[in-house]
Amino acid sequence: MKLTCVLIVAVLILAACQFTAANMARYGKTQIARSDVKSIDARRPKCCCVCGVVGRKCCSTWKDCHPVHLPCPSSG
């Protein structure tokens, strides 16, 4: 009986460890993916957008550029 209890506890601990390892691996992959997105976004050049009659405005991301993407002038 004692041996059975020890085996059950050992199996439960092993299962918990595997579950934790799988979750950590999944979480690690998610973290890597997020940091890749950030670094890709940081490498993109800042763009200048034509904003109607108001004129040009520099945006932090390409997503902010609407409706036209233009390269920033070298003077600016």
From Swiss-Prot:
Record keywords: Disulfide bond, Neurotoxin, Pharmaceutical, Secreted, Signal, Toxin
Signal peptide extent: 1-43
Tissue-specific expression: Expressed by the venom duct.
One function term, GO molecular function aspect: toxin activity
Compartments in which it is found: Secreted
GO cellular component: extracellular region
Domain of life: Eukaryota
PTM comment, free text: May contain 4 disulfide bonds.
Keyword Signal: yes
Family, per entry: Belongs to the conotoxin O1 superfamily.
Function: Is able to inhibit the growth of Mycobacterium tuberculosis (MIC=0.22-3.52 uM against strain H37Rv and 2 multidrug-resistant strains). May also show neurotoxic activity.
Comment, domains: The cysteine framework is XXIX (CCC-C-CC-C-C).
Protein name: Conotoxin Cal29b
